[in-house]
Design a protein with these regions (language model features):
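Surface-exposed cleft-lining segments at the edges of enzyme active sites
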Residues: 59-68
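Periplasmic OmpA/Pal-like peptidoglycan-binding modules at the C-termini of bacterial envelope proteins
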Residues: 10-12, 19-21, 26-44, 54, ...
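Short amphipathic alpha-helices and their capping/turn segments at secondary-structure boundaries
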Residues: 27, 72-96
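Catalytic core of IPPT-family isopentenyl/dimethylallyl transferases
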Residues: 5-6
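Short loop/turn segments at strand-loop or loop-helix junctions that form parts
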Residues: 44-59, 96-106
Length: 201
């Protein structure tokens, strides 16, 4: 069991709950062929009294700055190099949906962005499931929660690029989703990942 092993190795603490949901979806491809896609969705929650230590602090976006985010990504890595590696087939199609979330805490000033994930100019992004675009560069810095949510998502992409080389051999597409809550608090500053292995079964 991935979760148990991760807990034993202290990837995750008792107060971070990581949820891995899988489902098989019967659909048809572009040519009308009947195929089965395999969906893997990973999310997490943190016990309220630990949110301040384990969730992203206000204005923070690097995965390393959230114990819970890093724990979730460690689980994703473990799954993709272990139990789910049989779906990581060279030349096969995988769709990766990454979600960055931000809360409603207003910005008092622009926060510096060190350009660690590159500059983003008019990049396509799904905001509340509607296709939109976003700009955040070292020069602009971060002045709104949408940008913060986007950089949290880019941290996920960066982690996957660095830790799962198999994606480079697959036909991998990344879609970025951002969610900005009306509420304030660490519970609304999180990340999520959904993988769809196309024609996997």
């Amino acid at each position: 069991n991935i979760m148990q092993e991760a807990q034993d190795q202290n990837f995750i603490s008792d107060h971070t709950k990581i949820d891995v949901r899988t489902k098989v979806i019967n659909t048809t491809d572009a040519s009308g062929k009947n195929i089965y896609n395999y969906d893997v969705e990973v999310s997490y929650t943190v016990d309220e009294e630990y949110s301040a230590t384990d969730d992203f602090a206000p204005g923070r976006f690097k995965c390393e700055e959230s114990n819970a985010a890093l724990a979730m990504l460690a689980i994703v890595k473990k799954a993709l190099t272990g139990d789910f590696s049989k779906y990581m087939v060279e030349g096969k199609q995988v769709k990766v949906q990454i979600t960055g979330m931000a809360d409603a805490l207003p910005f008092r000033r622009t926060v510096a962005y060190d350009g660690c994930y590159g500059d983003f100019d008019q990049e396509p992004v799904y905001k509340n499931d509607e296709l939109s675009n976003i700009t955040v560069t070292e020069a602009t810095g971060i002045s709104e929660n949408e940008q913060l949510a986007y950089l949290r998502a880019m941290g996920v992409k960066d982690y996957l690029d660095r830790n799962i080389p198999a994606f480079g051999k697959m036909r991998t597409t990344f879609d970025t989703y951002i969610e900005v809550s009306q509420n304030k608090g660490g519970a609304y500053r999180r990340i999520g990942v959904k993988l769809t292995f196309v024609d996997a079964l």
